[in-house]
Amino acid sequence: MRVLMFGWEFPPHIAGGLGTACYGMTRGLARNDVDVTFVVPHAYGDEDQRFTHVLNASDVEALYGSTGSGADDILEKMSFIHIDSNMVPYISPEEYEQYQERYVKSGQKVWSTTDAWKQRYTFSGKYGANLMEEVARYAVVAVQVAKNLEGQFDVIHAHDWLTYYAGIAAKRVSGKPLVVHMHATEYDRSGENVNTQVYAIERAGMHAADRVIAVSNLTRNIVINRYGVPADKVVTVHNAVRFAAGQCKMPERGVDDKIVTFLGRITYQKGPDYFVEAAAKVLKKVPNVRFVMAGSGDMMNHVIRRVARLGIADRFHFTGFLRGEDVHKMFQLSDVYVMPSVSEPFGISPLEAMRSNVPVIISKQSGVAEVLDYAVKVDYWDVDALADAIYGLIQYPALAGMFVSKGLEEVTNLKWNDAAAKIKTVYEAVIKENKKQ
């Protein structure tokens, strides 16, 4: 079986759990005799390609404009005006006419999608101000990729909203079935204040797909209830964790204090403010504890100011974003790992912490809570319960030891090979259905 897979990041160049999940998944699929071509906007050349072929979208020469391809209506929805500003190039037809008239009068060139020309796009593969433009151009390249690989894949698999338009376009031009993977919804990222553009892309992708894979039942329910996707079309496949050699080397600790770690994006979804409030409560009882916030995000300055106001800055450490070996080192230095997410579709980090013999505290509002018994679970908003859980794990070694030993047994059974086998059955089902049409 051959899969054309569209992603936005791939290790070692990642911004979060999405790339890590994609890597584990492709390894698992390879062991289930599935051949994966993994397309990314920007490949660096140092990606591990032992289990998958990584295709760099920036190397693909695509036909842009009125091509009769599967991406034309996507381009119509996402028109681009090249001006020196931070404006996100995702506007309505009416707004486009207004901007076009204004810039034509000014004598500046406005590109129109009614003309076709060949072009090779240079993608950043990041999450910058021109993200929507890159999403649309990725769909244009996806058409060309599908044409170039005609007859070389049986199914298309697209990860998260960034690649959904690419998946739709590839499906239209190839006629192959489409599976979209929902790793995190816009409701997870933004609460009720959703970005309507992102929501529209998510909804379009899931309704165009033959199957939707959700990373948890929590996410599955959101997909069904918030996006109107038929329940029989949505399948839950939980994520897993990869065990690699050489993860047992203990770095020098340097301090005798207990270390409690938060590792993730410092943004609303991850609940960093609840971690800070709980830390302040713990420090009133046990002063010899250090709290580490490993990550970056839009709430960083807010969190730093709150730590200062609470008078606990001398007990707090901000490492910035960590990746690869630094993540493993951070876990090995930790006595407790905390994931207080407001809404977490799954959450691979607790599995990585448990793999490193660290007891974990997770929010009940997380997908990973569905597969873990030996993790302390609290409501994200219950700061008192979170503080009590941290206190218990650092003050009672026998309790922490039980969670470590039982947790390691539990997480050892969460294998990517098993998750990939479930994904393969989804592929087989949509391929069979597609042949009947």
Predicted regions and their residues:
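Carbohydrate-associated surface elements
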Residues: 218, 240
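Conserved donor-binding/catalytic core segment of Leloir-type glycosyltransferases
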Residues: 213, 254-279, 404
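Short alpha-helical donor nucleotide-sugar binding micro-motif in glycosyltransferases
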Residues: 321-322, 329-334
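Aromatic "clamp/platform" in nucleotide-sugar-dependent glycosyltransferases that forms part
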Residues: 342
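Nucleotide-activated donor-binding/catalytic signature segment of Leloir-type glycosyltransferases, i.e.
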Residues: 302-322
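Conserved acidic donor-binding segment of nucleotide-sugar-dependent glycosyltransferases
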Residues: 375-384, 392-397
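A conserved catalytic-core segment of Leloir-type glycosyltransferases
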Residues: 37-146
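Short hydrophobic beta-strand element within catalytic cores of glycosyltransferases
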Residues: 359-362
